[in-house]
């Protein structure tokens, strides 16, 4: 029976439990990458549920095979990871620092607490569809020619070491084989058991036909099931971390008809990787669009977005290793800014003087509105005429002459 098929109530008294955020494996750019789960630590096993009344766990990890440490690479605060270098890494995050330290202490004790586990026990198990928004059904592996009987499969598994190499190499131990099972009584959904497959290189027979393994799924007696497991264990290399296994719950609920699963060859594996790359490129289109809009200073609707202070500072301050050149560049920028201000003031004066309907009243109104400009003009004349007092600057005689002429 699968370790995940246990309700939250059936676990009984837990060593530690609470709400934690778990990082999704397939999170889109705009959606939330973390989902909240009710996590329960029982002995050396860690379960997480969608809620406290769930009848089945969404995931399970056998902690003695993993290591627990803080996840400094995550941007989310109070994050930690449950890591295995050859299998998988799970990321969790707590609400605050106190809860994170509590979980690290409990999980660290559970990791060091070794339990007697069988070889065919699952290291971890997790539901494929974590979120309906981000769940994408993986294409089934292409089927090849299957063997006609279990005896042929055992012969293929017990062949010579030169001819016993598998015909497919997988990039990681996370790849799974999805068995399309037909339940006899309830007819419920298909389940997926996690199978850890060892990286290997393809090999061909002397005749020229590729050698492939066929896993036959059918109902067996207890003695036959144990013999099949022994044959499967003998076919794997000593370097494999976790052995391939099917839960007894799956095998007992299948019909007598035999469903053959064959490991795809290198060509089919490359096709699957190409499809995954295409899907990842399609998922990144929104991210590329957002970055291009951000570089062009545009909003998602196409409107012009005002530049931020950081962008203005970057565009203005461009440092050079030579300090003298930096001073000259800064002086040039200040002179350009002063020139633009003076051109603006000159344009305002020309607009006033070019007005054919200019009257004394309009000039007084313009003078009140542009008091700073007039003060700046007369302050520049002070060094040339040192006898002028500040009162004369505020009440210049030339402005009276202009008004009289008007």
Swiss-Prot record:
User: Which intervals of the chain are annotated as region Disordered?
Assistant: 118-173, 228-285, 383-406
UniProt lists compositionally biased (Polar residues) regions at 228-239, 392-406
Localization:
Cytoplasm; Cell membrane
Q: Which GO terms describe its cellular component?
A: cytoplasm; plasma membrane
Quote any Pfam family the record assigns.
PH
Compositional bias (Acidic residues):
123-134
Task: Report keywords, A-Z.
Answer: Cell membrane, Cytoplasm, Membrane
- PROSITE patterns the UniProt entry points to: PH_DOMAIN
Q: Where is the composition biased (Basic and acidic residues)?
A: 272-285
PANTHER family from the UniProt entry: CNK3_IPCEF1 FUSION PROTEIN-RELATED, CONNECTOR ENCHANCER OF KINASE SUPPRESSOR OF RAS
Quaternary structure, per UniProt, is:
Interacts with guanine-nucleotide exchange factors PSCD1, PSCD2, PSCD3 and PSCD4.
Q: What does the UniProt function comment say about this protein?
A: Enhances the promotion of guanine-nucleotide exchange by PSCD2 on ARF6 in a concentration-dependent manner.
Q: What is this protein called?
A: Interactor protein for cytohesin exchange factors 1
Gene behind this chain?
A: Ipcef1
């Amino acid at each position: 029976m699968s370790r995940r098929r246990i309700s939250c109530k059936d676990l009984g008294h837990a060593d530690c439990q609470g709400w934690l955020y778990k990082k999704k494996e397939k999170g889109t750019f705009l959606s939330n990458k973390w989902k909240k789960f009710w996590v329960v630590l029982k002995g050396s096993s860690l379960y997480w549920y969608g809620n406290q009344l769930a009848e089945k766990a969404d995931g399970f990890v056998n902690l003695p095979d993993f290591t627990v440490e803080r996840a400094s690479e995550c941007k989310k605060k109070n994050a930690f990871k449950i890591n295995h270098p050859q299998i998988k890494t799970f990321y969790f995050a707590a609400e605050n620092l106190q809860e994170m330290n509590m979980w690290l202490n409990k999980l660290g004790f559970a990791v060091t607490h070794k339990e007697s586990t069988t070889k065919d026990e699952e290291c971890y198990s997790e539901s494929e569809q974590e979120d309906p928004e981000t769940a994408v059904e993986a294409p089934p592996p292409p089927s090849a020619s299957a063997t006609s009987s279990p005896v042929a499969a055992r012969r293929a598994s017990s062949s010579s070491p030169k001819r016993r190499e598998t015909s497919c190499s997988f990039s990681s131990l996370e790849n799974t084989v999805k068995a399309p099972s037909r339940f006899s009584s309830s007819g419920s959904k298909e389940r997926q058991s996690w199978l850890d497959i060892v990286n290997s290189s393809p090999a061909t027979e002397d005749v020229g036909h590729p050698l492939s393994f066929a896993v036959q799924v059918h109902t067996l007696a207890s003695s036959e099931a144990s013999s099949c497991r022994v044959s499967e264990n003998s076919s794997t290399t000593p370097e494999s971390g976790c052995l391939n296994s099917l839960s007894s719950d799956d095998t007992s609920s299948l019909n007598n008809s035999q469903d053959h699963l064959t490991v795809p060859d290198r060509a089919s594996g490359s096709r699957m990787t190409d499809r995954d790359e295409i899907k990842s490129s399609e998922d990144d289109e929104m991210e590329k669009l957002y970055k291009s809009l951000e570089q062009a200073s545009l909003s998602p609707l196409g409107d012009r977005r005002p530049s931020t202070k950081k962008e203005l500072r970057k565009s203005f301050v461009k440092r050079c290793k030579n300090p003298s050149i930096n001073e000259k560049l800064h002086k040039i920028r200040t002179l350009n800014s002063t020139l633009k201000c003076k051109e603006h003031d000159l344009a305002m004066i020309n607009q006033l003087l070019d007005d054919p309907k200019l009257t004394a009243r309009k000039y007084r109104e313009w003078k009140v509105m542009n008091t700073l400009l007039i003060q700046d003009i007369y302050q520049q004349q002070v060094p040339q005429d040192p006898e002028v007092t500040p009162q004369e600057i505020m009440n210049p005689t030339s402005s009276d002459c202009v008004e009289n002429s008007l």
